Swiss-Prot record:
GO-annotated biological processes: ganglioside catabolic process; glycoprotein catabolic process; oligosaccharide catabolic process; positive regulation of myoblast differentiation; positive regulation of myotube differentiation; response to ethanol
Protein's organism: Rattus norvegicus
Active site: D46 (proton acceptor), Y333 (nucleophile), E354
Name of the protein in question: Sialidase-2
Chain positions recorded as substrate binding sites: R21, R41, Y179, Y181, E218, R237, R303
């Protein structure tokens, strides 16, 4: 397995008095700004999550370097008496509105407790910003208006985590990937199903998309193709030793062709991964071809050795490449973004990932050519 050289590597969050988990990364193209989010916790455990924090990075295209500002707390992103978890940033290019979605869970109530009691106490929340995250609106609890009575049919749920997606359709639809543990049988354990929250009116109202196959959890989505050939590609965590993927022909409402992706291995209990899509370097401007890149631990036994995979025909689950290593040793969740061309003329990526025993959250920047030098067109 080859190791990828990188343009920049920098620790953004380091566990000392507080712990940090669950990275989310968003690139704002016109502002040349990166927003790196994470959960700030009293300890590494999920029940000790507290707030969502942010570091802002300014990208210098001349030096291919990101300068990061100090950590700040997104103080509005909280419900009283609840802990804030799973940051999911989304930027609406048409309205120039930045959304930060997250879940709010009361006190120290765990996900496992909700699964055992079958009582869903998790809330769907968001804050917004019209100045690229400098200032934020008061928190909005969207649970009743978006999920409604369906909330009681779930044992619990969560969004993302990581970046969301705005589609290239006429409505500029907004998609927030999510999953819910459904109570399908009074005796059987609740079962996780991935889906998307969808907005057709730039975030004013939201609806629930339909579910992907069972045993699909934390997920991300990417848009592949254009026009009549445009589909939403979903890639989800599972407990079955490999990732699960599906595609939606109707902008995230329904998913079909649910498939196990045997080349994308999962460790026991699975792990979050990140996916982005971009135009193939070998395609003409009017070509429909897209390429997908995906980051995730590469070991099927442990959360170790973060890799990046490439798929030049993303709807084919057998077409994923062998991974290129981004980092060795213990690692876990990651979030991936792509913007512009790097100094070698190939697409450039930023990756925010958990390292060590959740000791650090690290930012990496690299190019397609650095990761996959033999890909035609990345020379």
């Amino acid at each position: 397995m080859e190791t990828c050289p990188v343009l920049q590597k920098e620790t953004l969050f380091h566990t000392e008095v507080y712990a940090y988990r669950i990275p989310a990364l968003l690139y704002l193209k016109k502002q040349k700004t990166l927003l790196a989010f994470a959960e700030k916790r009293a300890s590494r455990t999920d029940e000790h999550a507290e707030l969502i924090v942010l570091r802002r990075g300014s990208y210098n295209g001349a030096t291919n370097h990101v300068k990061w500002q100090p950590e700040e707390v997104v103080t509005q992103a909280q419900l009283e008496g609840h802990r804030s978890m799973n940051p999911c940033p989304l930027y609406d290019k048409q309205t120039k509105t930045l959304f930060l979605f997250f879940i709010a869970v009361p006190g120290r109530v765990s996900e496992q407790h909700q699964l055992q009691t079958r009582v869903n106490v998790t809330r769907l929340c968001r804050v917004t910003s019209t100045d690229y995250g400098m200032n934020w609106s008061p928190v909005q609890d969207l649970t009743e208006t978006t999920i409604g009575s369906t909330h009681q049919d779930w044992a619990t749920f969560a969004v993302g985590p990581g970046h969301c997606l705005q589609l290239r359709n006429r409505a500029g639809s907004l998609l927030v990937p999510a999953y819910a543990y459904r109570k399908l049988h009074p005796v059987h354990k609740p079962t996780p199903f991935a889906f998307c929250f969808i907005s057709l009116d730039h975030g004013h109202t939201w609806e629930l998309g339909n579910f992907v196959s069972e045993n699909s959890l934390e997920c991300q989505v990417a848009e592949v193709g254009t026009g009549a050939h445009r589909v939403v590609y979903l890639n989800a965590r599972s407990f079955i030793g490999a990732r699960v993927q599906a595609q939606s022909p109707n902008d995230g409402l329904d998913f079909q062709d649910n498939q196990v992706v045997s080349k994308l291995v999962e460790p026991p209990h699975g792990c979050h991964g990140s996916v982005v899509a971009f135009h193939s370097p070998t395609s003409k401007p009017d070509c429909l071809r897209h390429v997908a890149a995906y980051t995730h631990p590469t070991d099927s036994r442990n959360r170790t050795n973060l890799g990046v995979y490439l798929n030049q025909t993303p709807l084919d689950p057998t077409a994923w490449s062998e991974p290129t290593l981004l980092a060795t040793g213990t690692c876990a969740y990651s979030d991936l973004q792509i913007w512009g061309l790097g100094p070698d003329g190939s697409p450039q990526f930023g990756c925010l990932y958990e390292s060590g025993n959740y000791d650090e959250i690290i930012f990496l920047m690299f190019t397609l050519k650095q990761a996959f030098p033999t890909v035609h067109g990345a020379q």
